[in-house]
């Protein structure tokens, strides 16, 4: 038995390598625009754009009398901006280095001066390091600070800021200006500070050509590529392929030196490291998303040129771009690329893409033998575009992944992947799940278009799973990219063991119902035996949404009954391996970085934050709270520093402008910004050892997300803070807040005042108070680590599947048989026992039933007036009140009950019971008495009091035909056999009436009621009819939960069917029934009405 793990990306991917000495290298070089031929002004602009942020900002001109903001680079003239705005295809320094290297290098080689602009900077440089940033030396250049940069199309305008100083704080050198020539040594465990040392291998990555056909969404791209084609000449079949050339982040030889499932920062669910990419990056599964303003956290991005911002510059192939009028050029380019990739050597390397927390957890479980290694099979995409790779090479790659790594690739064309992942997942589904409802006027058409690709991708995953599945295997599907897969697999494998885990938040029903495909997504999830969430809140939202939109029945707040199956809905937070992280903290490099940090910020309080750069992280609100804190506590301007690390390459210009205005405003509070900079804003991630060191030295860690799943960054901080026991400020809107609320300081990011006060509280908290709080946090981290998540999730999947297997042995309702019987019959009668008030959906279905000539009756214990009010909106509905005592025919009530004079005597008995059981009470209706004990103060005595009452009443009134019974802790006392008498009354009437629903005739309504007949008559007779028809009822259906009232009706229908009195009889019970006369079963009332609605529609 194997564990089949399905997620968007496999933990391994193919990597094509190219030796620069080979002839193919000249092809690669010639296919790209020559960067060294760029003009000097373009090089200057490139240096400006490569700053704290990944894109320049649009800023208004400063008002008169307000000091201008301090520039982070040399002053540019308006002409420079004009030249920049008129330049297309401008390559930035990032273009010289691929995103793969850029992501993995992080900050081990930060420079201490400006980002080089000279083309000679491609040569190796020595001794460039972040150590200069951490150095306490005051001889560091201070010509640049964290302040908003200008947009290329803004003629020299600047953001107004009260900053007066024209000096630079050395902290800006930490990761703000990464030396792009120092990128390899940390990846290959090289101690050298130079990058371009070592072998001459390069990685060649296929480029996605998805979306090259002309579409309305890609108009701007079409224009740009046409211009590029015109200026570069025509392209033919012999043109070089469109590929990416980068310095290898992991060569085949280097891959052998580290485990293939290497540890990843567990907070990077979808590897935020992979989000940092240059504008040229073209890997299908790893690119920036400039237009996605609600950038997903922990997620890879696919960058396709037609979806990029119109202001983004592009480097197009030298041979002239793409043809948008004919597919011939595209196929010619593909053939050219395939020729190259058919000759390039390739290897399988670990992938940095995908859910890092999930992969780390499974890897740990394998190492600890919780899951046998050979019993884990991975299903996912290969992580690179596949259109340009020849089919035989893809087949070889697939075989290698299957045979050596137990990884089964899902191969899909680039168009499908791009539309499903980037378009639907990233721009429709992910924002909605995080309460960011897309409001673009074109989003509806966009959503409908991309949905079919999302469904297609999910179907391919389902097919791949079915292909490798063997009896006894466990299928575990992960995250919102694959929400349709569970039901798709269930359709083919009805008895498979299937689990699904959602790693992001799940919104309330009011938000989720905004999705056009909401029912299809929910039905896809209900195909699983188990659906797991990160918090109780998200699980509750899913249950409520399913109940509201699917009319699924919810049981005990942890089960969902739908479509004949029970879905277990639980919450189990994913965690980290705290003990493994503790061992990494003892590494020598971490200790060295900690020493440098202590020397650099000696005597200062460090506030550390690490967030994805998007709107839901609350970065702007965090800075506003910090600003308010400094204004109200000015002594902390020189005593504290907030280091904000932003990861990802989102191009949200407006958000960046807002943030940088606040940053400048805060830094202007310092009297000498070159010595004391209150805010250090870094739009780039740290090396993991640096990140651990900084977290270990932090005096406060702040998470201010406006909505998030499980934030594992704060989990790692807790482990890192073993020495200092620093407080954690945690947003109440993160999944981690429900887990860490005992030890963390919970904040509301929108409450700026309390947020700022919480910062002061955290910084001034003494050690004797911090220590107990930290112990609570650490205990929660250990108790909810990755191992616990794996064990609990797999156990829940198995238990849920086992329950469904046992439940499947009960004779379930055969919907097909019910439909056939319904369609073949002419006169049909339904009796529903419904104890709760009807929903609007029930009312609608009942109206549909009665409008099609069906005889429909509702029976319950409600009095006549209440029952009439509840179902007044249903035309021609029949009613049976007080469990059969009264029957309504065409608006006229008929008495079935014989005697009611016993009620006062029974009431005297129950008065004594009420005195003995405070909180209980009884109600007297027209034909019955109810004794309620649900609100009794002493619940331990309820059972004994109920037993005494039933025994007393049945002993005294048995000879009078009065009986007491208990149902759901409510004692009901009434005449025996009323429900059965009412049903027999209806059968006799409708088997004799020519047209029982003919309201044009007053003959039925004027019939004498049973109560007006001679008291000596022992049997109630149905109202007479002037004509008698042989058109008897040939279809009878009785449904409800098992109870003493309904069981006689189940038996009656079965007897009528067995004796041939009705052609088809169906006795359907819903809910939990241990012993019943019913022969068919559904999970709940909502499911029953869903089946009924399908039958009457067909």
Swiss-Prot record:
Task: Give the superkingdom in one word.
Answer: Eukaryota
Q: What is its main location?
A: cytoplasm
Task: Give me the ranges of the annotated region TPS complex domain.
Answer: 320-812
* Segments of this protein annotated with the region Disordered: 59-86, 129-168, 192-244, 274-297, 1000-1027
> What GO cellular component entries does it have?
alpha,alpha-trehalose-phosphate synthase complex (UDP-forming); cytoplasm
Region annotated 2 X 7 AA repeats of R-I-A-S-P-I-Q sits at: 144-164
Q: According to the UniProt entry, which residues carry Phosphoserine?
A: 49, 53, 56, 71, 77, 135, 147, 161, 229, 303
Q: Which GO terms describe its biological process?
A: trehalose biosynthetic process
sequence repeat placement: 144-150, 158-164
Give the matching Pfam families. Glyco_transf_20, Trehalose_PPase
Kindly list any coiled-coil regions of this protein: none
GO molecular function (one): enzyme regulator activity
Give compartment(s): Cytoplasm
Q: Which UniProt keywords apply?
A: Cytoplasm, Phosphoprotein, Repeat
Q: Which cysteines are joined by disulfide bonds?
A: none
The UniProt similarity line reads:
In the C-terminal section; belongs to the glycosyltransferase 20 family.
The annotated subunit structure for this chain is: The trehalose synthase complex is composed of the two catalytic subunits TPS1 and TPS2, and at least one of the two regulatory subunits TPS3 or TSL1.
What job does this protein perform? Regulatory subunit of the trehalose synthase complex that catalyzes the production of trehalose from glucose-6-phosphate and UDP-glucose in a two step process. May stabilize the trehalose synthase complex, and confer sensitivity to physiological concentrations of phosphate and to fructose 6-phosphate.
The Swiss-Prot or TrEMBL note on domains reads: C-terminal 700 AA are mainly in alpha-helices and beta-sheets.
Please report the name of this protein according to its UniProt entry: Trehalose synthase complex regulatory subunit TSL1
Origin organism is: Saccharomyces cerevisiae (strain ATCC 204508 / S288c)
Q: Give the lineage.
A: Eukaryota, Fungi, Dikarya, Ascomycota, Saccharomycotina
